């Protein structure tokens, strides 16, 4: 079983989570992480897909400005060895071009700390931005999306990423 979790301020991350679910209907319906009473439910999944916006641009920590920020430490203490985890992030590549989707990296690092097998990396070459903490090598540590300046690209990026995830998370296939 694969769960889709998100946190949102304006509703955009929830909307994108729902749109992603249309491409991977074998996953559970998206769930707001603030509605999760016991994070240990994540330990019972084969795969986890997380959606996170970046609101606190330039911050060293708590970059999302959402419910994710208050549970990062708890995520790091979970036992997620062997679990596949993918992250999508929302940001604004033109207004906040020096902090594009920075919150993805923070969530990524805590899931890694919990022993998760991180998947869903996306090559940075098809994106226009100046800097992002979410770059590892030549790739983003997840799928960056820009609903402010590049919303016309979101559905095709989601569809491509969903296909990629079906190859990386066996229980989605």
Where on the chain are the PLM-derived regions?
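Short acidic/polar alpha-helix capping motifs at helix-coil junctions
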Residues: 2, 36-38, 71-74
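Short, flexible active-site loop motifs that bind/organize anionic cofactors or intermediates
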Residues: 3, 32, 148
């Amino acid at each position: 079983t694969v769960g889709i979790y998100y946190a949102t301020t304006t509703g955009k991350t929830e909307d994108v989570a729902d749109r992603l679910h249309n491409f991977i209907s074998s996953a559970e319906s998206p769930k707001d992480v603030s509605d999760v009473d016991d994070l240990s439910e994540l330990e019972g999944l084969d795969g986890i897909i997380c959606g996170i916006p970046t609101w606190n641009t330039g911050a060293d920590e708590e970059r999302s400005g959402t419910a994710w920020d208050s549970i990062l430490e708890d995520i790091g203490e979970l036992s997620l060895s062997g679990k596949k985890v993918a992250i999508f992030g929302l940001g604004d590549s033109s207004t906040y071009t020096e902090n594009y989707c920075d919150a993805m990296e923070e969530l990524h690092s805590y899931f890694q700390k919990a022993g998760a097998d991180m998947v869903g990396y996306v090559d940075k070459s098809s994106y226009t931005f100046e800097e992002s903490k979410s770059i590892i090598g030549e790739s983003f540590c997840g799928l960056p999306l820009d609903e402010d300046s590049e919303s016309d690209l979101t559905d095709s990026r989601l569809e491509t990423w969903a296909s990629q995830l079906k190859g990386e998370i066996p229980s989605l296939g």
